[in-house]
Amino acid sequence: MIVGIPKEIKNNENRVGMTPAGVNELVKHGHTVYVQKGAGENSGFPDSSYERVGAKILATIEDVYAISEMIVKVKEPIAPEYPLIRKGQLLFTYFHFASDRRLTEAMMSSGATCLAYETVELKDHSLPLLIPMSEVAGRMATQEGARFLERPQGGKGKLMGGVPGVKPAKVLVIGAGVVGYSAARIAAGMGADVTITDLSLPRLRHIDEIKPANIKTLYSSEFNIRAELPTTDLVVGAVLIPGAKAPHLITRDMLSTMEKGSVLVDVAIDQGGCFETSRPTTHSEPVYEVDGIIHYCVANIPGAVSATSTLALTNATLPYVVQLANKGWQKACSEDEALYKGLNIVDGKIIYPAVAEAFGLPCETI
């Protein structure tokens, strides 16, 4: 198979879809790999590192799309890429369709096969291609939230861990999955007073058994969240319904109960955001204010630490990339139920129920 690795063009997206080690594996299996010039530079992989393992370097993104049967990316295609995608081409990347009707319609019109990292699902309901980036995003959410609590960044000037004689910051994490617990652990490590909420009592029970002393668990409800907000300095939204649009768990009227200069970090922004007042931001303009509350809603948080996150992502994706290249997507997906669940759009048809439901469109089967 001919596999293409384009350079990511989303704002400050520094990751790359495959490392030289991954290219080496594909070449060993007899596949041809084309890499766009400079695609890996911001993750620490110069063109020469790809050439040494057998990749061919192409000058433009147009060249990569034109020649490749399978495109391996990190983030969803954006508007300049839409005309480059053709019928029958396989795209393997994060899509997050449920929050983006324009992207969904563009991919349906293209006739391409869209296989989404975020909905590949194992029998135990874990999401193996989402977990590594969730771990990174959770850690980064707390780091960035702590930064924007600083006065020069517009925050209330509060130190996460406090000092002797001064209370630490209060952190509320909504959602106790991989993102949420990663965020809570980092906040606890910084010395903050942390509360983590979830609807799953078994999950909260598990966290209660392994958590440090400064993390408390709380059942997630509108009443409980509303009660926490007046004394909370930093909120991390870490809600996930696989493939579906995130619910709004903090509404605009709740902001008035918070102190000015408090910070909301919405890690669920890829799926539409879990705060009513959320809208996507970028690494170059990461925050905005609503009613005196700072909102950090960067849609590709791990792109800021690309050297780490590219390795973490490709460690997880490579076995699936090799399967797809060796067998073709039809055979690979028919033999691997987890991979089959990654199929979102095929030949103009939505086949993932949560995406169809998000837009009131029919869900087909293949």
Placement of each model-derived feature along the sequence:
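Rossmann-like adenosine-cofactor binding region
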Residues: 209-291
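General beta-strand structural signal in soluble alpha/beta enzymes
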Residues: 5, 34-37, 57-59, 65, ...
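Glycine-rich phosphate/diphosphate-binding loop of Rossmann-like nucleotide-binding domains
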Residues: 6-45, 152-237, 287
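Adenosine-phosphate binding glycine-rich loop
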Residues: 118-144, 148-159, 269, 274-366
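An N-terminal-biased, well-structured beta-alpha scaffold segment characteristic
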Residues: 2-110
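Glycine/serine-rich phosphate-binding loop and adjoining beta1-alpha1 elements at the start
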Residues: 2, 8, 77-169, 298-300
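Short glycine-/small-residue-rich Rossmann-like dinucleotide-binding loops
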Residues: 69, 75-76, 95-96, 221, ...
